[in-house]
């Protein structure tokens, strides 16, 4: 009898690009991918912080490079990716949240959130896919979405709109790029303890509401997402594309 073998979670020999890699979810994703054997390019605006992350990953035996850039500056990003690609793995983790009631949200709030969470994600993802197609390589692209890409919440209208749109964008791209061997999925976390998330958790009323919705009774940690990132990036998820992986402690189960 030939027993089935577990597909590999290793990423040796693959190049990965992680946006928002200087902190939070992006930092965790970069570390996880490096631990799995990928050569990781860390993309964010803060070059000094990126250099610290790179040096620590290298000190622990991983492979890492940095790309200091603003993902909303599309011509510069396009030029940089064309020079450094192709990347077999992408984690779009850079994001922006402005929690304002829908009746009070300004056009500037809307445009700022959409510029990062949707516009930059669209064009950066497309550029990575173009590089893979030109090189004739398969790949796995991961958009960090949110549970708010599947539900709504008070003071979340603009943010939820950006994440619902990201979900639809991911599905459409999956249909177009599957013939090229390019998979694309979303990872949808609940509230995670990050520098961005701490701003929300400092409000006692909001924190109480959040904990009432998370059935496991705690907010998420960056470490809760590191395994799922490696799973989606690796051959272990080879039959997944155009769908989502929700890590929300049971929030969306009801």
Please provide the spans of the model-predicted regions.
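Residue(s) in the substrate-gating loop at a strand-loop-helix junction
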Residues: 146
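Active-site loop immediately N-terminal to the catalytic Tyr-X3-Lys motif
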Residues: 103, 151-157, 179-180, 217, ...
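Conserved glycine-rich cofactor-binding loop
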Residues: 15, 22-24
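Substrate-binding pocket helix/loop in short-chain dehydrogenase/reductase
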Residues: 101-102, 106-114, 210
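Active-site helix of classical SDR
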Residues: 125, 162, 170
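Alpha-helical segment proximal to the catalytic Tyr-Lys
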Residues: 130, 175-179, 238
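C-terminal substrate-recognition "lid" of short-chain dehydrogenase/reductases
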Residues: 122, 183, 218-247, 252-253
